[in-house]
Amino acid sequence: MEKLMIEGGTPLEGTVQISGAKNSAVALIPAAILADSTVTIDNLPDISDVRLLGELLKEIGGEVELADQKMVIDPSKMFAMPLPNGRVKKLRASYYLMGAMLGKFKKAVIGLPGGCNLGPRPIDQHIKGFEALGAKVTNEQGAIYLRADELKGARIYLDVVSVGATINIMLAAVLAKGRTIIENAAKEPEIIDVATLLTSMGARIKGAGTNVIRIDGVESLHGCRHSIIPDRIEAGTYMILAAAIGQNVLIDNIIPLHVESLIAKLREMGVDVEVLDDQVRIRNHQEKKGVDIKTLVYPGFPTDLQQPATTLLTQAHGTSIVTDTIYNARFKHIDELRRMGADIKVEGRSAIINGKTKLQGAKVRASDLRAGASLVIAGLTAEGITELSGVEHIDRGYEDLEQKLIGLGAKIWREQMSDQEEEQVKSS
């Protein structure tokens, strides 16, 4: 196992290039199952979740080539191979295989997903959608079994706005008979990205990006070529990092509209944010002041940036309150920040941060992907050296993290853990 070593205190400067969106990639790759011919996806981030999905497509008979941020998928020999165990459980987004395989083969067996440990992430809205389309769904020994004689379009109202359920129902509905209407649909940019791919394959989808999506089923879908949108969460992470310890940082290959809620909060804190066509520049000249943040579904403040933002607010003057309305278990990073000297207490779904505090390097552990990002920011801000374990979580969602940070002047490197350190991590 590896750990990240971070020597903090060096102001960052330069340009960082944003990769393709992880949250799009993990849905676009399963979507290729629905096609009858080759699908090529460009601008893929080089992260472990993408590699894992490529391997899963091979397990069900697909031919997959992955090189230079491009995946070429030939789905013509795929079949409804059950995937109750193994790799499928390592990946939260493996649930998109349910919608895609149900849509293509009218049956699927998928082990319940893993990935980030954020408390219960129920898939009841996904199942409700599949059942409305005519599928029989059972949960047996930690795997979801789906079967349908035929899928028929339906009107589906989501009780909770869910990106995962919106995409999964789209995947299952594009080859169903008749019209499907998803009401109270999520509006995230990644949903538009998936709808764009499916439309290029021949699907008939209207309203993606609004709260009502209409899908008219078609007989078959063909291959296509698609380029993924930039990763708004990676972009936001670097914007927060630049606000915490940057002097003059240019974030390149970004859609500013997708990070509007973050731009507004940074400006409210007193950060100098310059918005260009496909770039954002962060300059840091003055003291930052505390603000209150409440996570909401898009276009509100993203839950995926709540943890990095919490770290930033330790460096702002005054009291800030961060409330996560999406995932109430997303505060595992706070104990680690406290080890570094942060003054934070958790009350229910809120973290109350008293700043400004000087953070000190410490041994800390990332419990999930975005907690890892928040602790990297903390390490770069802190005095001394921070040792960060749980690096595998970061590798799931951030491409070339160290190289991008080194390009900005950060002092960050990897080391192998000792046997004793590995034992400590496994037992904690």
Curated annotation (Swiss-Prot):
Keywords: Cell cycle, Cell division, Cell shape, Cell wall biogenesis/degradation, Cytoplasm, Peptidoglycan synthesis, Pyruvate, Transferase. Cell wall formation. Adds enolpyruvyl to UDP-N-acetylglucosamine. It catalyses: phosphoenolpyruvate + UDP-N-acetyl-alpha-D-glucosamine = UDP-N-acetyl-3-O-(1-carboxyvinyl)-alpha-D-glucosamine + phosphate. It is found in: Cytoplasm. CDD domains: UdpNAET. The keyword Hydrolase does not apply. The gene is murA2. Belongs to the EPSP synthase family. MurA subfamily. It comes from the Bacteria. Gene3D superfamilies: Enolpyruvate transferase domain. This is UDP-N-acetylglucosamine 1-carboxyvinyltransferase 2. Phosphoenolpyruvate binds at K22, N23. GO terms for cellular component: cytoplasm. It comes from Halalkalibacterium halodurans (strain ATCC BAA-125 / DSM 18197 / FERM 7344 / JCM 9153 / C-125) (Bacillus halodurans). Its main location: cytoplasm. Pathway: Cell wall biogenesis; peptidoglycan biosynthesis. One of its GO terms (molecular function) is UDP-N-acetylglucosamine 1-carboxyvinyltransferase activity.
